Structure formats: structure tokens, C-alpha cells
Amino acid sequence: MDSKLLLVTQSGSVDDLYSLIQAAPDILQKVDVLPIIHTPLHEASSAGKLDLAMELMILKPSFAKKLNEYGLSPLHLAVENDQVELALELVKVDPSLVRIRGRGGMTPLHLVAKKGDVDLLTDFLLACPESIKDVNVNGETILHITIMNDKYEQLKVLTGWMQKMRDSDDVFIDVLNRRDRGGNTVLHLAAYENNDKVVKQLVKCLSLDRNIQNKSGMTALDVLRARGSHMNKEIEEIIQMSGGKTGGSLSGIQEWYIFLREPVTFKEHCKTRIARYRSRISDGSRNALLVIAALIISATFQTAAQLLDKEKLDKVKKNGMRFSEFQLWGCNTVAFSIAILFSFILLPVGRAYEWWYFIITVPLVFSYFLLMYMMHGLSFFFLIIYEGGLFLVYLLVLYVKWKRCTQMKVRKPKSDLISDNFKNMV
């Protein structure tokens, strides 16, 4: 950096900066052309020259994303030198600065977690929630870094953030179960450190996988027991009570390469086709088909709810239900059942949708058959149950079997080199 520009930066004078620019209009551009350099913004951020730093963000916003010869951005330097106000102002201008990877893949958010500033950590997360996904060159997430530096309060903030945020639940689950270069999750680290407070905090997260194996095939429980006489018995009990197991007890789980080399069965073929249909259908088509299914459910239920007039009802009680009427009610029940199942298949992927759907539709189906019993008596009720209800149960059982097949017990890969599309295979 030019010596005159360095002196102006160290002084923090905005007026002196513009005087220098008037004398040499290209002075900032000469700095900007270099890919790695200690820019005036680096110097201002390190020294806490707030006014000058904000002026440089206007003149040359590209400075904020450059790394100096030590692999640090201006925001890294502001965090390292406890320039909290300046760091927050930089993030206000460009929240993505929180995700800049410096030396070792460390982001400013990682540095904040390492230093232990809870307030700044929260501010960074609020400004850029996606930054929680970032990992360093060792594959360590912010959770790994927090545990390795024994920052318990920061861990409570992070786990609380992941559990209370309403969006991107899958992202936070991946962060919680992410493995570092050695295949160790945050639970492995906590078990190795014999840190009972951290283990208790982690197992409160329902999305935490207690049985992930590292590259040595060890679960968190194995890592804990490997400490021998130094093992904390309380931690062992906590992990076991939360569902943690040893790697040996998981030996029956199928390896990925075995699963992939096996021939595709007809059931897997059908499962794949349905899964692709659910994932590829557009929102517009899904909404239109759900409306059609809802209309069919409404029409068939209304047909079942139509009361016979007194003359026909007496005739039915005297002579019984005619075969044609029985077929009408049977076909109506089948249509009702298929519409219920079809609308279930059309739901977006996610267990929350499925559970709410069951909560709503089970009383509806029950009231449908109860209505027929009240209108036509026990004998007709059992006939319809045999033709329609049994068909519905069969379809639901078939779907449950298919659903279980999609969640086959396959050992998780020993690295995180797996895309979201591949995860959807099983």
C-alpha cells in the first residue's frame, strides 16, 4: 500500500483521504487490482477508524472481500481487535461479509465463536443466518469450534437458535450432525472431552443423531468408553438414555456400497417413481390436483350423507339393500378412499405435513363410516367396510411399507461428501 495512503488511513481522517484522491484519483484503484493485499479498509478496521472505514465501503466496497497477506478480511481484523461497533457497521452494509472464508477456512463468525462474544455472535446470526452452515478446512462447524474452545454459553445460543428458527430446518439438522475431517460430530467431541454440560445440552436437540460413526467406526458412546477409567459415568448414562449405542450394535446396518450394487426390485422402482413424482411436480400442478382431490372427497362424503326419504328408508329396512345400491355405495367409498390417499401422496415432502394430514383425515374417515352405520344399519355397514374400508386399509398399509423402505437402515457415509439429491434416494 502507498505510504501516503497508509498515513492517511492510520490518521482516520476522511478529509485527508479525499485530498489524497484529488491529487491521485487512481490511488485506490491501484490497490484494488491486486487480489491479495492489505487494503486501507483492513487498516481502518484493525485500528477502529469507523468514519474512514464507512467512507471506504462507499468508495471501494470490493475492499471488504479482499484478504490480506495473512489471509484475513477487514471484518476478520475488526473481530480480532475487538472493534465491535465497526464490525457491526460493516455487516449492516453487507451481511455476506460474515461468510468470507479466511486463513484455514475460518469465517468472522468462527472467530466470534472462538473469542466468546455472545452478543456479537447473535448479531452475526441475525444478519446472516446461513453463515451457520460454513465449515473450515478441517470440516469443523461453528459448533465444533465452540466446543473445542469450551464456550458453553455460545453453544447454548447456537443450539437454541437451531431449535427455535422456523426456516431451513434441514440446514440446521445437517449442521448439528456434520462431521469434521476425522468423521467426528460435536457429540463425539463432547464425549471425548468428558464434558457433561455440553452433552446434556446437545441431547436436548431432537434432531441430533446419537449414533453417527466416525472414520474409525466409533460412535460417541465408543469414544467415551475408550477413555477407560477416565470415563464420566454420568455422560455414559445420558447418551444411552437418549438412544446412543455402540458401533458394534450397529453392525447389522447395511453399507452404502452394498445397497448401491444390489439389483433394483419392483418395489424400489415404484418407490423411486413416486418419490420423483412428488419432488418434481410443480407447485401449480400440486395445488390444482389437491383441489380436484378435495372436490372428490367433498362430493363422495356428501353423497354418503344424503338421507333417504322415509318411504325408501322403510323399503330398505323391509327388503334390504339392493345389489345396485350396494354397488353405488361401494364405488362411492372406493372413490372416497382413493381421493384421501391421492391427496396424501400429493403433500409436499416433510413429516410435519403428513402428521397434520393424519390428524385431520382420520376423524373424517371415521365419521364417513359411522354415518353409513347410522343410516343403513349394522349389516350394510359391515358390507361397505368389507368392500371400501378394507381397500383403504390395504392401500394405507402398502404406503406405510413403502415409506419404511424409503428409510432403509443404511450406514451413513464416513464423509460428508453427499449431495441433497443423493440423500433423497433413501
UniProtKB/Swiss-Prot annotation:
Effect noted on mutating residue 74 to L: In bad1-1; suppression of constitutive activation of defense responses in snc2-1D mutant
Q: In the UniProt record, which is one GO cellular component term? A: plasma membrane
Q: Which InterPro entries match?
A: Ankyrin_rpt, Ankyrin_rpt-contain_sf
Q: Record's Pfam families?
A: Ank, Ank_2
The ANK repeats are found at 1-29, 36-65, 70-99, 104-134, 138-167, 182-212
Renumbered to this chain, the signal peptide range is none
Main localisation, per the record? membrane
Q: What is any one GO biological process for this UniProt entry?
A: innate immune response
Stretches of the chain forming a coiled coil according to its record = none
Note the superkingdom of the native organism.
Eukaryota
Q: Does the keyword Iron-sulfur apply?
A: no
- Cystine links in this protein are none
User: How does the protein's chain sit in the membrane according to the entry?
Assistant: Multi-pass membrane protein
Sequence intervals crossing the membrane: 288-308, 329-349, 355-375, 380-400
What does the UniProt keyword field contain? Answer: ANK repeat, Cell membrane, Membrane, Plant defense, Repeat, Transmembrane, Transmembrane helix
Q: Tell me the compartments it is located in.
A: Cell membrane
Q: Which SUPFAM superfamilies match?
A: Ankyrin repeat
**What task does this protein carry out?**
Involved in plant defense. Required for basal resistance against Pseudomonas syringae pv. tomato DC3000. Required for resistance against nonpathogenic bacteria. May be involved in signaling components that function downstream of SNC2 and upstream of NPR1 and WRKY70 to regulate defense responses.
Query: What is this protein identified as?
Result: Ankyrin repeat-containing protein BDA1
